[in-house]
A protein has these predicted regions:
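The feature marks the mature, well-folded catalytic cores of soluble enzymes
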Residues: 1-320
Length: 320
């Protein structure tokens, strides 16, 4: 059965690659989604990421793959090609949920064909309608953090705006997911709970992680009042408040993620997660709930914009 939550025993996983990762020339989509807070975009470097970043990221991804294989988890990889953006984060472009494999209508136009690099591993893909770029982006968001990048005309969202808890999908409204996107998922028969006014920048998986049924890890800098900020269906869940993360830094002048990569962990099963190797304060908190941590490197998580949840796509979990 396809994966339908974040915690059941992992059976088959797609792991990204860093080959030929790009910082594309700045378009309206990149300007509004990625760079709205930047005044002078002329200082933004474009082109391939430095060779050191690519090499070290691929080394760490191989270490992750070796760990999966030792856990008897089947590993699948994208094809190496020349992407418009990268193939590092398969989580961002495809939603797996129960009977659905959905290629999502991503916020960055440059990423909408990214999923085809691992298409050979997917059966019966539903391809969401492509948004109209001419009307999608709200340029008023530039230098105004109170305005989101996406207009509410066409459905538009990254798959990583969503986390799964069996029949329920939790959907972050942000620069990479509009309310129309949640409506589209409901039209496919999904139960969708929107989360708003929590984190505007990009994805949900540096703010909330589901560890097992009824237990979640929360970012205390973004979630300050559970009953006001989260859907009622989560109000009775037990909470682990993430301790301050250890900042692993980033390649000079290239930062694509906040320090909160500790929350961007991956559950192997309800009692084991993969955690960035420096986050021992979180490891200690997880142990209090009977959750062990495999401490692995991901040196360029902040540079490339993704730690273990982002760089993987759990295709099959053995549901308990």
């Amino acid at each position: 059965m396809l994966s339908k939550n974040e915690w059941d025993p992992l059976n088959t996983v797609i792991v990204g690659i860093a080959d030929n990762a790009m910082r594309p020339p700045i378009t309206n989509s990149l300007r509004t989604v990625n760079y709205a807070n930047i005044i002078d975009t002329g200082a933004i470097e474009v082109g391939h990421y430095p060779a050191q970043v690519i090499e070290e990221a691929n080394q760490d991804l191989e270490i992750l793959c070796d760990f999966f294989r030792k856990e008897n988890i089947k590993v699948l990889r994208p094809e190496s090609n020349n992407p418009q953006y990268y193939n590092y984060c398969p989580r961002d472009t495809v939603l797996i949920h129960d009977n659905l494999i959905l290629a999502t209508p991503t916020a960055l136009a440059e990423r909408r064909s990214e999923w085809t690099s691992f298409q050979k591993h997917l059966d019966q893909v539903t391809i969401a309608p492509t948004p109209n770029n001419a009307t999608l982006y709200n340029i008023d968001c530039i230098r105004n953090s109170n305005i989101l990048a996406l207009n509410e005309i066409d459905p538009c969202f990254d798959a990583a705006n969503i986390i799964r808890a069996n029949d329920d999908l939790y959907y972050l409204v942000s620069n990479t997911g509009n309310k129309k996107g949640a409506e589209y998922l409901r039209s496919l028969g999904k139960t969708v709970h929107t989360i708003e006014n929590v984190y505007s920048y990009i994805h949900i998986d540096s703010t909330i992680a589901f560890l097992r049924e009824g237990l979640m890890l929360l970012n205390p800098k973004r979630i300050t009042n559970v009953k006001e900020q989260l859907p009622e269906s989560l109000h009775n869940w037990d909470i682990i408040w993430a301790p301050d993360p250890i900042d692993i830094g980033y390649y000079p002048n290239i930062c694509n993620a906040s320090v909160w990569i500790n929350i961007n962990l991956l559950s192997i099963n309800p009692n084991l997660v993969v955690l960035e190797e420096h986050q021992h304060n979180l490891r200690i908190e997880l142990e209090k709930y009977g959750i062990e941590s495999a401490m692995l490197p991901m040196r360029h998580a902040r540079t490339l914009g993704g730690c273990f949840h982002c760089v993987t796509l759990d295709l099959i979990r053995n549901h308990i």
